[in-house]
Amino acid sequence: MEATKSSKQNCCNPVKKPGPVSIDHVLLALRETREERDLRIRSLFSFFDSENVGYLDCAQIEKGLCALQIPSGYKYAKELFRVCDANRDGRVDYHEFRRYMDDKELELYRIFQAIDVEHNGCISPEGLWDSLVKAGIEIKDEELARFVEHVDKDNDGIIMFEEWRDFLLLYPHEATIENIYHHWERVCLVDIGEQAVIPEGISKHIKRSNYFIAGGIAGAASRTATAPLDRLKVLLQIQKTDARIREAIKLIWKQGGVRGFFRGNGLNIVKVAPESAIKFYAYELFKNAIGENMGEDKADIGTTVRLFAGGMAGAVAQASIYPLDLVKTRLQTYTSQAGVAVPRLGTLTKDILVHEGPRAFYKGLFPSLLGIIPYAGIDLAAYETLKDLSRTYILQDAEPGPLVQLGCGTISGALGATCVYPLQVVRTRMQAERARTSMSGVFRRTISEEGYRALYKGLLPNLLKVVPAASITYMVYEAMKKSLELD
């Protein structure tokens, strides 16, 4: 601490705290003349206006952000364009661009001063930490060090206003300490390619619970929308005869009408929040434990280790909520006879406990866990390959936008699910049967009595779920993030 304070006193250029902030204060902090600033802004405009047309459109801004290697350029381009285009004529001329630069630099200087409470003309790690804590953001020492290191371009341990400005100049949102931290978190921590198993970026933020709310609502919406396909898939998986989709649909309708297609969906929704929470926290614990064992920071562990940590976290989450999954399957596969109503959840759960014992709630758990690592590995490898192909052949080396990433994730997820689908069929059959059976026994009996094709019963409705589920989850999640002010 003392070393940092000494460094701060030696390296910072003290600046008196002014009253109302003006461009003159910005020039003083940057040690820049008006002419030099004009030239700098004009040069930046020309950089974006690479075709010398005299104005900027959204495509030019997006191209410029990609050239500057700014992550999320596809998204910020639209938002930056909207903020700059003051007269809403669909183009940004130099005067509009200049007005944005003036407003943004003044805004950044104000918050720079708010963090620099000692008015030394620089931000120290301690000052930044104090501001984050006051904003309700928990941050570990190593995260703070990475934050400072990312912004501190000359590596002197402190952040000058020029470095602060460069980091945030093209950030189109209001520069509050919460937004700035969230921006850094996304820029530096989120890597969709390496997070195919569990996405990161929720670290120790004050609004962490809101991410779970957004994810929970998105998951509930997508599961409800695809519930009929899920019920159809489960019924086809347990069929001993040739599984025909039309007959299965008729059976569902006969037994429950429209509501029959949504049987078990309530439990499916209930699983979302605890499964996501357990998976996230287990992932963080496994990353920390593996990083400590390898003598590395958890942020520096490689893709393979992340894949393993994600798989282990998925296994823990799956095992924790597995009884709910088994009861859901029993509800979905229950056949009403002679007008007998489907039993209530409590009655069905009690019946399983009394007649089959507590172990029955974990029937099929082993094949379920067995498929996690292969699925994650195939999903990750396919995702990375598809993203690279899209970058090379479709986007001309630009970074994939959210829709391209969604498409890559959808295809890779479908491929991974198909490869481990036989394990899913075996799991469902073990869950649905009252008799105690082993995984190998179900495999052998299925193949000998029905052939290898039986291991893929219900695959079509399972694949048909993928696109709408991914699309609905993405759209609802993005909408919820805006509603909860997470963006």
UniProtKB/Swiss-Prot annotation:
It comes from Arabidopsis thaliana (Mouse-ear cress). Expressed in flowers, leaves, stems, roots and seedlings, mostly in aerial parts. It is a multi-pass membrane protein. Ca(2+) 2 binds at D152, D154, D156, E163. Calcium-dependent mitochondrial carrier protein that catalyzes the import of ATP co-transported with metal divalent cations across the mitochondrial inner membrane in exchange for phosphate (Pi). Can transport phosphate, AMP, ADP, ATP, adenosine 5'-phosphosulfate, sulfate and thiosulfate, and, to a lesser extent, other nucleotides. Binds calcium ions Ca(2+). Also mediates calcium uptake. It is found in: Mitochondrion inner membrane. GO terms for molecular function: ADP transmembrane transporter activity; AMP transmembrane transporter activity; ATP transmembrane transporter activity; calcium ion binding; calcium ion transmembrane transporter activity; phosphate transmembrane transporter activity. The chain crosses the membrane at residues 212-229, 264-283, 311-324, 364-383, 406-423, 458-477. Residues 1-211, 284-310, 384-405, 478-487 are mitochondrial intermembrane. Residues 36-71, 72-107, 108-138, 139-174 form the EF-hand domain. Keywords: Calcium, Membrane, Metal-binding, Mitochondrion, Mitochondrion inner membrane, Repeat, Transmembrane, Transmembrane helix, Transport. One of its GO terms (biological process) is phosphate ion transmembrane transport. Counter-exchange transport activity is saturable and inhibited by pyridoxal-5'-phosphate, EDTA and EGTA. Activated by calcium Ca(2+) and manganese Mn(2+) ions, and slightly by iron Fe(2+) and zinc Zn(2+) ions. Repressed by copper ions Cu(2+) and slightly by magnesium Mg(2+) ions. Magnesium Mg(2+) ions promotes slightly ATP uptake, ATP-Mg(2+) being exchanged with ATP(4-). Solcar repeats lie at residues 206-289, 301-389, 400-483. The keyword Calcium applies. Its main location: mitochondrion. The N-terminal domain can bind calcium. Residues 230-263, 325-363, 424-457 are mitochondrial matrix. InterPro entries: EF-hand-dom_pair, EF_Hand_1_Ca_BS, EF_hand_dom, Mit_carrier, Mitochondrial_sb/sol_carrier, Mt_carrier_dom_sf. Ca(2+) 1 binds at D85, N87, D89, R91, E96. Belongs to the mitochondrial carrier (TC 2.A.29) family. This is Calcium-dependent mitochondrial ATP-magnesium/phosphate carrier protein 2. PROSITE patterns: EF_HAND_1, EF_HAND_2, SOLCAR. GO terms for cellular component: mitochondrial inner membrane; mitochondrion.
